[in-house]
């Protein structure tokens, strides 16, 4: 039954009560070896590699199947005890072998063991624990100091790394802000260019509409002119507003470009600073790498020192345990001898000498224990102060560990943020590249649009100038016509009939020419379909030819529009004259004779105008011929252009049809237009003024276009600057990525170091907790024993004999069970030590063989103490040889042993013994529980 279940607070779960105090079942076992008394002595015990020994028969009957000693009732407490030590020669090996390992405990149990002295042994145990606690406290203090220095250095290094990472993080944030600003600037520039493009398109549309209105303006339709004038005035007002807005935007763009140039300069300076800082960080990182390597070497040295200290502490523990065991053994022997002396008065002088020797040894040991106890008592005060100091240091270490953990989390977060920032920066650089290409395309489109707008503006300017001149001439002619119209009435009728006839003839001719043109266009389309294959090879030439063709088309359009205007003017004049003649027939009858001459002159003028129109028609024909020639030259034009040509030709045909319809409608509307002519004259004068203002506005627009061209050049410069800055950002990003990888590696190394420190600190805390728990358990056990002593003394008079017998039997059983347990553990320990020795010997031999095969010799300063170096099987500078083997009796580590009857019999015997021992163990546990309950009930204390 485990005694720890009755201990308070459950702090001694691993302990078991014995007469000498509490011990742990694994840690505090002694290292003595149980030796069988029937074992055959080995003369070559030191040289186990010399070869296998022949089989020898055991001398005792106890190890055979015929043994019946285990089954006797008298051996209830002696089943698993070690036997008498016999025929064991002293070990010839010297060095690190423990002389007390193979101590025989059978002498301790030759006779009945008297009652032990638990209080005295408890005091010895307490002194021993105090000494161990003091030694371990010193070791923990040294370790704590070393760990504190190392932790401080690590914390300082980590703080430096954290500051560097924070600075890099701040710089990366600034770079991100700058990149976002540049992207926003790109977006604003893109929006502004789109707005400019839309405005230019709107201006182009308005100019086209204006040109159409000017071209399709009717001289005699005064209401249409008034409406057109009002529309033009509205459009001019809108254009002026738009021009103002465009100017404001242009000024804003200029200001933005200045601001961006300043920002770019500042960014360049910041980039230079960042480059310098990155170089400094690299140099610092290299220095820190060297420092880390140096610290790693120091850590290794310190770990080696710690291992050595642990080994020394274990050796000291073993020595103390051995001394305790020796003192116990001597006390037990003394007690046995005293009992024997009291029982048997006639004892030999040899035993008296042994008693004296044992008493002297006990006295010496007690003096040593007393001195050590005094030293321990003196050192306990120091230990208390050291423990307080240690607690303070541990609290500081915990605080710093928490700080390190928070900083490590911050480092992880910053590392993740840096990686995200790098990814975002890469994506932004890609998007920047795409946006830059889009901006380049848009700039090219804007340049083309500006070129087209300039052309259209110059053309519209020439058209407006021509219109103004023609309108001035028309006004003068109309004034003369108003005066002379009545006189020319009679002549105009004849001339009108002739002109109508000639007009019909010209219309028929125009229709014939139109049909011929359509046929030629169809032929040209067929030729164009044949020459599509050649278009791909001559794309550059076609582009220039396309521009020439567009110019020629524009010239054709102008000529056709001028021809229409002249035809309309002539028809308008004819209709006006007809209307005037019809209205003024009554008034003109008296003045007819006078006006005939004037009408003749007008007829001559009209004939001249008709001749001019015929010349214009012939010029149109020549233009069409030129168009044919140019079209033959432009055989490599694209299919889209052909489609546009067809549309334009259809538009021309529709315009011709519309012109015919307009001629008919003009004939009907001329009667109404004469009445409104004067009003129209005034309107025309106003329009003249308006057109003059339009000239001025056109010159302003030209200035604006020049300003826009300058802005486009500036935007191109900004684009190149931004591309350069983009490349710089890419280089910086690569540097930041490399720095981030380096910092990540350093952080991992720091995490490893911090984990090692935490492991060591956890070990220290565990050791400290174990010591404190042991101290508390010992104090409580001491208090409990003192209380039990007091209670026992009070009840001594009542039932002393019965209680003493119970206590004696209880402690006797307890002692015997502990001795058996210790002996079993010793056997296990010796077996494991043998296995370890064989394994290490095999490894050493194999390593020596490998070194010899590779011609590697040990250095001269190798002072390791290894027993097998001096063996005749293998020396330091001789060839490797395997030990001698017997062919008939193959035993040893290199051959499997042959099973024999004796091994099987011994196995069966061991099983029977194990069963018997388990049975007696259970019976002993039951007896112990009964005795403990009886003692506790008799002492007045019941433990549940």
Swiss-Prot record:
Motif (Nuclear localization signal): 54-59, 726-731, 742-747
Gene Ontology annotations for the cellular component aspect, listed alphabetically: cytoplasm; nuclear pore; spindle pole body
Key words, A-Z: Coiled coil, Cytoplasm, Cytoskeleton, Nucleus, Phosphoprotein
Pfam family, one: Spc110_C
Highest taxon in the source lineage: Eukaryota
Region feature Disordered, mapped onto this chain: 23-110
Cellular localization per UniProt: Nucleus; Cytoplasm, Cytoskeleton, Microtubule organizing center, Spindle pole body
UniProt keyword annotation of Transcription regulation present: no
Modified residues (Phosphoserine): 60, 80, 529
Coiled coil: 119-799
One GO-annotated biological process of the protein: mRNA export from nucleus
Residues modified as Phosphothreonine: 18, 64, 68
Polar residues biased stretches: 28-46, 67-78
InterPro entries reported in the protein's UniProt record: Spc110_C
GO-annotated molecular function: structural constituent of nuclear pore
Chain intervals for the UniProt region annotation (Calmodulin-binding): 900-927
Assembly description: Homodimer. Component of the SPC110 complex containing at least CMD1, SPC29 and SCP110. Interacts with SPC97 and SPC98.
Family: Belongs to the SPC110 family.
Name of this protein: Spindle pole body component 110
Gene that encodes the chain: SPC110
């Amino acid at each position: 039954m485990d005694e720890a279940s009755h201990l308070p607070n459950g702090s001694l779960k691993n302990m078991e009560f014995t007469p000498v105090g509490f011990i742990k079942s694994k840690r505090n076992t002694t290292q003595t070896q149980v030796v069988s008394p029937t074992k055959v002595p080995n003369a070559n015990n030191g040289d186990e590699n010399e070869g296998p020994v022949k089989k020898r028969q055991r001398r005792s009957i106890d190890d055979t199947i015929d043994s019946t000693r285990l089954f006797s009732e008298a051996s209830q407490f002696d089943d698993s005890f070690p036997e008498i030590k016999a025929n064991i020669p002293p070990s010839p090996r010297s060095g690190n072998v423990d002389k007390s390992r193979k101590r025989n405990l059978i002498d301790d149990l030759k006779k009945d063991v008297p009652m032990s002295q638990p209080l005295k042994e408890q005091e010895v145990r307490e002194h021993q624990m105090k000494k161990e606690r003091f030694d371990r406290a010193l070791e923990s203090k040294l370790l704590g100091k070393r760990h504190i220095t190392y932790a401080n250095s690590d914390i300082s290094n980590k703080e430096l790394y954290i500051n560097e990472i924070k600075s890099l993080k701040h710089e990366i944030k600034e770079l991100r802000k700058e990149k976002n600003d540049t992207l926003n600037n790109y977006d604003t520039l893109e929006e502004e260019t789109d707005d400019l493009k839309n405005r230019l398109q709107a201006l182009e549309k308005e100019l086209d509409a204006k040109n159409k209105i000017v071209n399709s303006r009717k001289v005699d339709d005064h209401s249409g002119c008034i409406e057109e004038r009002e529309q033009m005035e509205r459009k001019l007002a809108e254009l002026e507003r738009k021009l103002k807005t465009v100017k404001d935007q242009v000024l804003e763009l200029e200001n933005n470009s200045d601001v961006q140039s300043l920002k770019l300069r500042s960014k360049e300076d910041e980039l230079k600073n960042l480059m310098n800082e990155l170089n400094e960080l690299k140099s610092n990182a290299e220095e820190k790498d060297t420092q880390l390597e140096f610290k790693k070497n120091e850590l290794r040295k310190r770990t080696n020192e710690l291992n050595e200290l642990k080994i020394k502490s274990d050796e000291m523990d073993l020595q103390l345990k051995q001394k305790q065991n020796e003192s116990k053994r001597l006390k037990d022997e003394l007690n046995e001898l005293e009992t024997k002396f009291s029982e048997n008065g006639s004892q030999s002088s040899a035993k008296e000498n042994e008693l004296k020797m044992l008493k002297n040894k006990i006295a010496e040991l007690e003096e040593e224990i007393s001195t050590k106890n005094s030293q321990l008592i003196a050192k306990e005060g120091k230990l208390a102060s050291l423990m307080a100091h240690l607690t303070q240091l541990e609290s500081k270490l915990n605080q710093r560990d928490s700080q390190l953990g928070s900083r490590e989390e911050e480092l992880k977060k910053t590392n993740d943020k840096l990686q995200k920032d790098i990814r975002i920066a890469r994506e932004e650089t890609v998007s920047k590249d795409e946006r830059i290409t889009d901006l380049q395309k848009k700039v090219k489109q804007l340049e083309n649009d500006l070129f087209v707008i300039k052309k259209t503006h110059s053309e519209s300017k020439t058209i407006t100038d021509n219109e103004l001149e023609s309108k001035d001439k028309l006004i003068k002619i109309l004034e003369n016509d108003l005066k002379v119209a009545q006189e020319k009435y009679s002549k105009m009728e004849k001339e009108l009939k002739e002109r109508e006839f000639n007009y019909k003839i010209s219309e028929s001719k125009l229709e014939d020419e139109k049909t011929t043109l359509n046929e030629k266009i169809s032929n040209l389309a067929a030729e164009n379909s044949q020459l599509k294959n050649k278009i791909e090879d001559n794309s550059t030439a076609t582009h220039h030819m396309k521009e020439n063709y567009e110019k020629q088309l524009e010239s054709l359009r102008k000529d056709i529009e001028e021809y229409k205007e002249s035809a309309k003017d002539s028809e308008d004049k004819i209709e006006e004259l007809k209307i005037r003649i019809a209205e003024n027939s009554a008034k003109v009858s008296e003045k007819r004779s006078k006006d005939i001459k004037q009408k003749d002159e007008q007829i001559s003028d009209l004939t001249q105008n008709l001749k001019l129109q015929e010349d214009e028609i012939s010029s149109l024909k020549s233009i069409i011929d030129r168009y044919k020639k140019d079209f033959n030259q432009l055989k490599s034009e694209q299919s889209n252009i052909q489609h546009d040509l067809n549309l334009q030709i259809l538009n021309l045909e529709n315009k011709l049809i519309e012109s015919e319809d307009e001629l008919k409608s003009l004939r009907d509307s001329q009667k109404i237009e004469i009445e409104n002519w004067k009003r129209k004259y005034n309107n025309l004068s106003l329009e003249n003024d308006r057109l003059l203002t339009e000239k001025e506005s056109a010159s302003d627009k030209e200035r604006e276009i020049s300003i826009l061209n300058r802005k486009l050049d500036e935007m191109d410069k900004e684009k190149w600057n931004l591309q350069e800055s983009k490349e710089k950002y890419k280089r910086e990003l690569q540097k930041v990525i490399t720095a981030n990888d380096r910092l990540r590696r350093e952080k991992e190394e720091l995490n490893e170091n911090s984990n090692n420190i935490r492991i060591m600190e956890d070990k220290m805390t565990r050791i400290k907790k174990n010591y404190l728990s042991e101290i508390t358990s010992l104090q409580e056990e001491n208090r409990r024993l003192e209380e039990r002593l007091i209670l026992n003394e009070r009840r001594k008079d009542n039932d002393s004999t019965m209680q003493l017998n119970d206590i004696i039997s209880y402690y006797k059983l307890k002692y015997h069970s502990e001795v058996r347990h210790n002996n079993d553990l010793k056997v296990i320990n010796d077996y494991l030590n043998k296995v370890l020795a064989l394994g290490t010997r095999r490894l050493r031999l194999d390593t020596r063989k490998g070194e010899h095969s590779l011609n590697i010799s040990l250095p001269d300063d190798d002072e390791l103490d290894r027993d097998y170096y001096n063996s005749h099987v293998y020396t330091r500078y001789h060839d490797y040889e395997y030990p001698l083997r017997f062919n008939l009796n193959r035993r040893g580590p290199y051959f499997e042993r042959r099973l024999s009857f004796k091994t099987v019999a011994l196995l069966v015997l061991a099983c029977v013994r194990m069963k018997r021992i388990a049975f007696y163990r259970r019976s002993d546990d039951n007896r112990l529980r009964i005795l403990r309950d009886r003692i506790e009930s008799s002492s007045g204390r019941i433990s549940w």
